Amino acid sequence: MKYRRLKGTNDGGPICANAPDAFALKSASKITLQPGEEKRFIFMLGEGNREAGKVMREKYSNFENVDRAFAELHNYWERKCSKLQIETPNEGMNTLINTWTLYQSEINVMFSRFASFIEVGGRTGLGYRDTAQDAMTIPHSNPEKCRQRIEELLNGLVSKGYGLHLFDPAWFEKKEETSEDEFKSPTVIPTSEKDRIHGPEDACSDDALWLIASIVEYIKETGDVSFADKIVPYADGGEDRVYDHMKAILNFSEEQVGADGICKGLRADWNDCLNLGGGESAMVSFLHYWALQNFIELAEYLNRTEDAEHYKKVAEKVKAACDRELWDKEWYIRGITKKGKKIGTMEDEEGKVHLESNAWAVLSGAADHDKAVKAMDAVDKYLYTPYGILLNTPAYTKPDTSIGFITKVYPGLKENSAIFSHPNPWAWAAECKLGRGDMAMKYYDALCPYWQNDMIEIRESEPYSYCQFVVGKDHTAFGRARHPFMTGSGG
């Protein structure tokens, strides 16, 4: 094999994607393999200047160095994967959980779900909820990275208790003066410090609530109890203990409620396209209740009885409001618009049943047993498909700004009645909590990419990666998976 430089600038710099030989390596001679014969070749692809390329090429033109690097890479992942191994009769579950779901989670924590081979993306930095969700998946395999991400999120928390939905951790780092020009991002991001700290009306109401569980999981997994009392700055100035950051988050959600005691959706909740015109979110109220339970567990462990008792009373109030306002005969509604219309009711022609609110009613423990069973029965009846669970149904077809941008999304895609992967595990966990393991496994196998490899002409995506969504039944491409790795499902 002869090395061929990619066509580009004379100094081996950036290349043009439209150039005829862009991203192509060609063999200088034909390679013939006889039956059973093996030959080894070293294939190199990288980016950098000419000098860096020479150094790397020289090092890895040696098979011994290549083998050593490969062994180091193997050992690196073996150490991580060995922290959690399962053995079940389900081959797909074994393969995914023992290797690929951890790998996907590690990648997401590293790149905050914006590293993709197929999507350019429109952001840079850390997505608050994404990073908080991903951090809680790796305390056993990568506690250092888990803690780093948690501290960055704490730095990105405003003292009032809400997170900056998208921020760059470098904003809050003390940097030495440099004469070098800063990197010019192609993505539009806040350019002045005053633009970086948005007000509560632009906060996503669920963002910081995820961080409560991330912190508790980190402490439980590592035993790093002292972390709760570490002093960490706020995004808008001042500093406090990690423990007090958590209290600020809970207090913010307690304050940001509508007339009926249900948490306001603010800019949006987990479903960015369903903002209910700034109304109230059932999912966030259940998430608030769940975060309260996590915090109470930590407060009791730390013998901070007064805090534990206070937040138990808050939790009782949240649970009562959810029971009073969100139950609709057979399932939980999704929310209430700013104009007071309930969304996700039996009377709705579109968006009748939603996955998030029903799964979280059960997961949080806010639903009593009978309602929990009915809610998950509704999920099975209305939302289950052979490829996974729909986010909602029937799909929206009529634009309605009081509900949100979801009503303008093409039916069966993304938030509008697609099989959005991330909420599917919430349903698995909810069924496990109800003691209905067979239902959980039915849902698991439906979404599991391993079991979809024999229908690759439909799925069109890797058999080892959960994708952001699978096209729903209201679309002609029902079953097609899109945006691999761009999801928290792996956790």
Language-model regions: role of each:
Residues 46-90:
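Terminal connector regions
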Residues 126-131, 135-261, 282-289, 417-440, ...:
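Aromatic-rich carbohydrate-recognition surfaces in CAZymes
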Residues 164-166, 287-403, 444-480:
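Catalytic cores of carbohydrate-active enzymes
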Residues 1-35, 94-98, 105:
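Trp/Gly-enriched beta-strand surface patches
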Residues 50-55, 221-235, 292-312, 434:
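Inter-helical turn/loop segments and adjacent helix faces that build the functional surface
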Residues 116-125, 166-206, 235, 260-281, ...:
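Carbohydrate-binding/catalytic loop surfaces
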Residues 31-49, 288-291:
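Short Pro-Gly-centered flexible turn/kink motifs
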Residues 71-122, 148, 152, 252, ...:
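Low-complexity, Ser/Thr/Pro/Gly-enriched N-terminal "stalk/linker" regions
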